[in-house]
Amino acid sequence: MSEIILEVQNLKKYYQQGTLFQKRESVKAVDDVSFVLHRKETLAIVGESGCGKSTTVKSLIRLTEPTSGKVILNGEDFTSLKGKELREARKKLKIIFQDPYSSLNPRMTVRDIIAEPIDIEKTWKTRGEREELVLETMKLVGLDPTWINRYPHEFSGGQRQRIGIARAIILKPDIVICDEPVSALDVSIQAKIINLLKQLQEELNISYIFISHDLGVVKHIADRILVMYLGHVIEEGSCEDIFNHPSHPYTRTLLNAIPTIGVEMSENTLIEGDLPSPSNPPKGCVFHTRCPFAKEECKLKQPEVKDLGNGHHYACILNIENESE
């Protein structure tokens, strides 16, 4: 296994509710999340909207400060860095945003959008050097260099996302966070963007944290998968293990919901009920209110994490293979 470049330890993000004189229970958006990321690896974080996957990523890169926990980046405690040290470390962490339409400034040319990170960090000495870096990056992501003076409105969604990707990689970061980078694109364009991300990973040795609710997309890019529900990690494993041997009932339901040509979706593939409020999560197992296999014991205590070997583990008191027979 390649070297670990990111380690997240017991990360929590709670939001305080109420007023100065009347406190209420905190919203536990992220609750005790831990994982590692290896060099040149793609870790997908999946789950329904509201499961905590985006807040997890915002907390680990400190767009919002975590309540507690540690983030170790390249052997350094990223959560304790301040000022110049924090700014320096952030050069190694970049984001590709979900919406290629709203994430690009309509008043800026392609040149200035892609050059924004190197302008902020002042990594070039001459205008010629800046131009060369931008053109080189445009070629890497499959953009015609003659488009350098154009504006975002002149491009399709896929081309705009390539501009966003170019902006993210121009500083040659170690880690790129992909926040649902293809969800706003047509299916035919999604495949091209996924292939581009894989190509860039090979060429630049990038590691990805890939946030998605679409396991059909995740299957084509992820090395490992982290399944989240209501701020908790409920299953983690290699892409192969998660797809071939899903062990948590929530994971199984997500996989069953992937559309398949020629196969009708049954009612059993749907999760009953709504996602509970993170300000008032269920006692015991957080999934028991929607789980088709839930027992009385599930309501009383949090499940221990079961290790299935090869980095595959899940949090459930049940042996799901036996329960589903």
Predicted regions: what is each one?
Residues 151-155, 159:
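Conserved ABC ATPase signature
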Residues 61:
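Helix-to-loop junction immediately C-terminal to a conserved catalytic motif
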Residues 181, 185, 189-266:
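P-loop NTP-binding/switch modules centered on Walker-like glycine-rich loops
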Residues 77, 128-146, 255:
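Conserved ABC ATPase "signature" region
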Residues 69-77:
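Conserved ABC transporter NBD signature motif
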